[in-house]
Swiss-Prot record:
HAMAP family: Coq4 (MF_03111)
Binding site for Zn(2+): 210-211, 214, 226
Summary of subunit composition and partner proteins: Component of a multi-subunit COQ enzyme complex, composed of at least COQ3, COQ4, COQ5, COQ6, COQ7 and COQ9. Interacts with COQ3.
EC number: 4.1.1.130
Protein name: Ubiquinone biosynthesis protein COQ4, mitochondrial
Catalytic reaction list: 4-hydroxy-3-methoxy-5-(all-trans-hexaprenyl)benzoate + H(+) = 2-methoxy-6-(all-trans-hexaprenyl)phenol + CO2
Organism: Saccharomyces cerevisiae (strain YJM789) (Baker's yeast)
InterPro entries: Coq4 (IPR007715), Coq4_euk (IPR027540)
A GO biological-process term: ubiquinone biosynthetic process
Gene this protein is translated from: COQ4
Transit peptide start and end: 1-10
């Protein structure tokens, strides 16, 4: 038996060696062919681009120029040349697509601010922005804002200074609101899809002032608070997206939330928006040291019921009712 096993092992040995002898030369030929033909292919490409036999040509510069030509060719497919930093010109059909997609996403995913940003610009029609421009031109503060074009950032507002202001000032109220809601004026998205530079700035100004509206009305950034402020903006400024939000956004809320909005906050927002001064004309940066109560009176803004308090009271009431129900259920359940 031992002899038979040795014979079998020695019989298979040449076959394995033969296979290994075939595989190794094939692998070597493949590697050598790749080097030769790959090099020839690269040489052919370089010859086609004219990068051989001329040591005086800056090939890196030529490659950069070719890239620039491709970018220009792509830019020529746009509806116009960009008119300001960050401008993305769109054709009409692209604007319609932007409106449809952002509108759909905003309705089903309102928690994603990017959808709201896109919908805002998609619905910011030139006629609306021109009307807002005329509103600003008719007011001395509005004209100054258009002329100076301030940019609202934490650096400009000096947040450390706001934290030390008297507690009755609007600046301190604004600072505390930012801190409580954990937001910053630096997080506002830039305007990209509005073509006219002045219109783009006006919409940027509207967007950057949004948090001031929250702070002066003591409205949180939860969904009910956002809908309320959008309704205020729609009534006061005629912002199309804000009007749409005030009408459609409540449809996806819980019954108790819709009831609060329809009975309390939306009527307040519409009434206040129609009666107060155009908020786009307020130079908020210059109002930070004013008494907040006096500023509200000057702007004809009345405070709504505290939304945070109402939500807490309802949560406490629901917790109390649940506790009573569970207690009664345990009492009536036989041991």
């Amino acid at each position: 038996m031992l002899r038979l096993s040795l014979l079998r092992s020695t019989a298979t040995l040449p076959v394995k060696c033969q296979r290994r002898g075939l595989i190794l030369p094939a692998a070597a030929m493949y590697t050598l062919g790749s080097l030769i033909f790959g090099k020839e292919a690269r040489l052919a490409d370089a010859m086609e681009r004219g990068e051989l036999h001329n040591k005086n040509v800056d090939y890196a510069k030529e490659a950069e120029e070719r890239t620039e030509l491709r970018i220009r060719a792509l830019a020529n497919t746009r509806s116009m040349e960009p008119r300001y930093n960050g401008h993305v010109p769109l054709h009409r059909y692209e604007k319609l697509l932007l409106f449809a997609i952002s509108g759909w996403n905003s309705f089903f995913h309102p928690e994603d601010g990017y959808n709201i940003v896109q919908l805002g610009e998609a619905t910011a029609l030139p006629v609306f922005l021109e009307n807002l421009k005329q509103t600003m031109l008719s007011d001395s503060s509005g004209r100054r804002i258009l002329k100076e074009q301030p940019n609202i950032t934490t650096e400009i507002l000096h947040m450390d200074k706001l934290a030390k202001l008297p507690h009755n000032t609007f600046g301190y109220v604004y600072y505390q609101w930012l801190k409580r809601e954990n937001v910053s004026p630096d997080t506002r998205a830039p305007v990209k899809f509005i073509d006219d530079p002045m219109h783009a700035y006006i919409f940027k100004r509207y967007r950057q002032c949004h948090d001031f509206y929250h702070a002066i009305t003591n409205m949180p950034i939860i969904i009910e608070g956002e809908i309320t402020i959008k309704a205020l903006e729609g009534a006061n400024l005629g912002v199309p997206m804000a009007i749409l939000g005030g009408i459609l956004a409540p449809l996806r809320l819980k019954k108790v939330q819709r009831k609060r909005l329809y009975n309390i906050y939306l009527p307040w927002a519409v009434r206040t928006g129609l009666s107060c001064k155009p908020l786009i004309n307020v130079y908020w940066e210059e109002m930070l040291e004013k008494d907040v109560t006096a500023l509200r009176k000057e702007l004809k803004i009345t405070l709504p019921p505290d939304l945070r308090t109402m939500r807490k009271e309802r949560a406490a009431l629901r917790k109390e009712i649940d506790a009573k129900y569970n207690s009664q259920k345990r009492a009536t359940t036989p041991a």
